[in-house]
């Protein structure tokens, strides 16, 4: 259940727990898989299944500074693509973040068909070596015009020192972001329409779930690692829950 501050619209309270993924075994939970490849040419990272390790209490996605196929870094990417997707509901990622300039952690929802329309919901991103600032965002990649809506909040706790819950509620016409059960931002279809922006989040296509740890290029948001960035760097996922 989320706490909504004054000024927030009432979010739908989804009560049926439809997925309860615990990353506490020797293998990824059924429905999750590790992928190989790049991020469509973005970032300085080649993702490899070998960079995903089960610790017994979490899935550890580790970035290393070892070149592969023209990319200077390797790291881990896991998703439910092809196994589970959702149109509306609440998603809760319980995770522990790495610390370091150039590290770009992501907990997000993507649509399988990158044609028309195509949207992306970022539940959590953390970068710039700042483990107190959480970013949540929406992206419309098609139809044109492309647009992004960025929200953020500052955590009192250091996200690299323990596990926290990063949450999003997707309901018809509205997206709500939260950390540890406290909502910090909302964005609505009405706001998008007023700004002349398409809204691909109600088309019924469904979104699958992704967790990845990328390493940024110098020209990208957050910038590249520097001499203070320690490798290997690890993001841990303990659980993912979905209510509908």
Report the location of each language-model feature.
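GH16 jelly-roll
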Residues: 2-244
């Amino acid at each position: 259940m989320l706490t909504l501050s004054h000024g927030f619209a009432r979010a739908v309270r989804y009560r049926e727990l439809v997925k309860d993924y615990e990353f506490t075994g020797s293998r990824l939970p059924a429905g999750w898989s590790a992928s190989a490849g790049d991020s469509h040419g973005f970032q300085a990272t080649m993702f490899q299944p070998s960079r995903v390790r089960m610790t017994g209490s979490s899935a550890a996605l580790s970035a290393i500074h070892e070149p592969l196929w023209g990319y200077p870094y390797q790291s881990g990417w896991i998703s439910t693509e092809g196994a589970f997707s959702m149109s509306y509901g609440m998603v809760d990622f319980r995770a522990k973040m790495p610390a370091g300039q150039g590290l770009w952690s992501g907990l997000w929802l993507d649509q399988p068909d990158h044609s028309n329309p195509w949207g992306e919901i970022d539940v959590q991103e953390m970068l710039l070596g700042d483990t107190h600032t959480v970013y949540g965002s929406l992206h419309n990649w098609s139809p044109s015009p492309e647009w992004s809506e960025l929200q953020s909040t500052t955590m009192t706790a250091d996200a690299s020192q323990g596990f926290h819950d990063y949450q999003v509620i997707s309901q018809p016409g509205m997206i709500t972001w939260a950390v540890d059960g406290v909502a910090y931002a909302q964005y609505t279809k009405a706001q998008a329409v007023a700004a002349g922006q398409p809204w691909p989040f109600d088309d019924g296509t469904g979104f699958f779930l992704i967790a990845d740890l990328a390493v940024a290029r110098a020209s990208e948001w957050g910038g590249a690692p520097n001499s203070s960035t320690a490798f290997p760097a690890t993001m841990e996922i303990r659980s993912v829950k979905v209510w509908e």
